[in-house]
């Protein structure tokens, strides 16, 4: 028989840097989980991605055990790295802060593909391009499917 789920916890933690201080400690402590056990497992699983902000979905069971899934970094962070900017524009429609091309968008879309609800790479590229525009980045060049 499968374990009964009591809830989920979503967090964004830097790879290899989980520790019991906020935000990790209070979020897991309120569910009654062993915080140090999570930190050890998370750090071991993400030691190859140090300093990269990673979303994690923790499934909490009635016996206070847990499973977690580490997802790919947010598209906004990958776009900021590609455009070499610190953060997006406060007014994305007026003030442009950088530029990305379709090759960079394809690379990011391929990285994000497991976490996106898209079947085709073109659909994933459109999602990433939309995120780029909402950050105040211009998408240079012509889309590959608009020949």
Swiss-Prot record:
Gene Ontology biological process: translation
Entries under Pfam families matching the protein: Ribosomal_L11, Ribosomal_L11_N
Key words of the record: Methylation, Ribonucleoprotein, Ribosomal protein, RNA-binding, rRNA-binding
Gene3D superfamilies: Ribosomal protein L11, C-terminal domain (1.10.10.250), Ribosomal protein L11/L12, N-terminal domain (3.30.1550.10)
Classification via InterPro entries: Ribosomal_uL11, Ribosomal_uL11_bac-typ, Ribosomal_uL11_C, Ribosomal_uL11_C_sf, Ribosomal_uL11_CS, Ribosomal_uL11_N, Ribosomal_uL11_N_sf
Gene Ontology CC: one annotated term: cytosolic large ribosomal subunit
PTM note: One or more lysine residues are methylated.
Single annotated GO MF: large ribosomal subunit rRNA binding
Family that this chain belongs to: Belongs to the universal ribosomal protein uL11 family.
Subunit structure and binding partners: Part of the ribosomal stalk of the 50S ribosomal subunit. Interacts with L10 and the large rRNA to form the base of the stalk. L10 forms an elongated spine to which L12 dimers bind in a sequential fashion forming a multimeric L10(L12)X complex.
NCBIfam families documented for this protein: L11_bact (TIGR01632)
Main function: Forms part of the ribosomal stalk which helps the ribosome interact with GTP-bound translation factors.
Protein name: Large ribosomal subunit protein uL11
Source organism per UniProt: Cytophaga hutchinsonii (strain ATCC 33406 / DSM 1761 / CIP 103989 / NBRC 15051 / NCIMB 9469 / D465)
Gene name of the record: rplK
